[in-house]
Amino acid sequence: MAYRIAFASSDGKVINQHFGRTQKFLIVEIDEEVAKYIETRENKPSCEEFQHTEDAMTRSISLISDCKAVFAAKIGRGAIAKLDEAGIKSYETPNFIEDIIDKLLTTKKTLF
């Protein structure tokens, strides 16, 4: 069964963005033994000047609502709670996107 994952990344290679400050999410679909790039979604960051608004947070989560998980370099506690409420697993790991995808494909694990 295929599922989508969002990665908070400035360059499409490394998970290097804070969830609340990322300007884009790279969307990848995982299906059995294949990972497929879907698109890059532009995001208006929900954190500005060390705080966030509920509307902006809701907008960011809505942008990735078709994803089962999001990977970011950092994710605040409030965002983790809101993502969980939306049914989106959150993972805080500054890593290479390709390494995460390879691990998912080789272990044949789902995140859910």
Language model regions located:
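Mid-chain, well-packed structural core segment of small domains
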Residues: 53, 59-89
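Non-catalytic interface/targeting segments
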Residues: 1-55, 59, 66, 93-112
